[in-house]
Amino acid sequence: MASYDLVERLNNTFRQIELELQALQQALSDCRLLAGRVFELPAIGKDAEHDPLATIPVVQHIGKTALARALRHYSHLFIQQQSENRSSKAAVRLPGAICLQVTAAEQQDLLARIQHINALKATFEKIVTVDSGLPPTARFEWVHRHLPGLITLSAYRTLTPLVDPSTIRFGWANKHVIKNLTRDQVLMMLEKSLQAPRAVPPWTREQWQSKLEREYQDIAALPQRARLKIKRPVKVQPIARVWYAGEQKQVQYACPSPLIALMSGSREVSVPDIGELLNYDADNVQYRYKPEAQSLRLLIPRLHLWLASE
């Protein structure tokens, strides 16, 4: 059980995040808006969090509407702030960018504010995932006992400031989480599951136990040096590619929230060129580079566990 001191730290850190976000919203509102473009994505319904997305239609908002949506988005931390039909397990994404005219002093002040908020968010995430000492399955209940309705991913998400960018382009990224494992590591995973029997719908406890035993036997029959890997697709993500003309450098950013471009004019860029985010269509994805696929055989679908050929 997490200690009282830890719960106090959890609550205090979160309250600081809320207060700092409110102050940042006011500070950003006080700046002159040069340009704004955000892209509204469809709401994810309850129980549809893990459904693969073949298409994602995008609705664009510009100017003051984009700024208002961006400011609201930064503090969208609770399910009570959204429709009852929207999933509480999937954080809302709003890719895009707001560009604000600032003096050099204002730029430094806003950068410091954002850095402080991001540090608080990192502290909050560490309290939940590390300091609590709780396994992932118990964290949700613990956090929501003290902060009912919190969308934890939204609380963890950092803000991304840009300093005098020249161009901002948007796109989509398809990725996989890949983890290489030995046969013995997989056997240990399955052994832990076997030692904690439970029912997993639609299977009864006995049926699930029998399924685990078959999986264990299949893996145990492999050579000890078998090359195994978990290859799990990650939900397609909006990204931004930002070009800094002064440094002749392009940087790619994850873009679940609007980027905050602070334009001081010191690099001879008055307003950056902001591109569009097009609708996503899985059947028409164009890869910049797609390496030759390794020959893999699926062994345990529920774990996304594959056997690589020698």
Curated annotation (Swiss-Prot):
Subcellular location: Cytoplasm
Molecular function GO terms recorded: DNA binding
Listed Gene3D superfamilies: 3.30.54.10, Replication terminator Tus, domain 1 superfamily/Replication terminator Tus
Cellular-component GO terms for this entry: cytoplasm
Highest taxon of the lineage: Bacteria
Tagged with keyword Zinc-finger: no
Spans through the membrane: none
Broad class of where this protein is predominantly found: cytoplasm
GO terms for biological process, alphabetical: DNA replication termination
Any Pfam family hit: Ter
Key words of the record: Cytoplasm, DNA replication, DNA-binding
InterPro entries reported for this sequence: DNA_replication_term_site-bd, Tus_dom1, Tus_sf
Function: Trans-acting protein required for termination of DNA replication. Binds to DNA replication terminator sequences (terA to terF) to prevent the passage of replication forks. The termination efficiency will be affected by the affinity of this protein for the terminator sequence.
Family under the similarity heading: Belongs to the Tus family.
Protein name, per record: DNA replication terminus site-binding protein
